[in-house]
Amino acid sequence: MLNQDQLFEKAKSSSLYRKILNSVLYKMVPFNKPHRFQIDKIDDDSITVKLPYIKRNFNHIKGVHACALATVSEFSSGALLLRKLGRKYRIILQKLEMEYHYQGKSDCYATFSVDDNWLKENVFSPLESEEKIVVPCIVKTFDSDENLISTATIKWQIKSWDKVKTKA
């Protein structure tokens, strides 16, 4: 059985393993299953998640619903942070801010990127002296025609599991 790191690693280059990873994520986060989010692309420092243009993701004028855009933004940043941070840290959503630029009328793609330098500067170094930190993560979502649909700022609280008082 593959562990989380192995599954993410294989999903970088294999559509079969991306499909398996998406199935696992549907089970881990059942709230997202009806939206049919799919990890479209993943590499060492970024992830792109597809928000399909399907009826359950529509608003009242058959555009992509604002809440679906917010949820795919949270999902993409959370998935990459979990992959990069591993099991040592707990992440929990503190705040989510959305700015909507254009009405989505096709599949949308939310992309989040962080590199090791960003993690060192914004997560690991601050956690050496703080019990918990809050990091802002910027997620941009584009439609199939490359129109900028939304920009999300997701603030994640990060804390070492050994400092958490209420266990999962």
Model region roles, listed by residue range:
Residues M1-T48, K167-A168:
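Non-catalytic linker/capping segments at the edges of enzyme domains
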Residues L80-W118:
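Hydrophobic beta-strand-centered segment that forms part of the acyl-chain substrate-binding groove
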Residues Q38, E97-E99, T111-S113, K140, ...:
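Residues located in well-ordered beta-strands
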Residues K33, I92, C108, I133-C137:
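Hydrophobic core residues within well-ordered beta-strands of beta-rich domains
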Residues P52, N57-S76:
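Hot-dog-fold acyl-thioester-processing enzymes
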Residues K33-I39, Q94-E99, N122-F124:
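Short structured motifs
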Residues M1-L16, G104, D115-A168:
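HotDog/MaoC-like acyl-thioester-processing domains
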Residues S46-T48, V64, W156:
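Soluble, non-transmembrane catalytic domains of enzymes that act on hydrophobic metabolites at membranes
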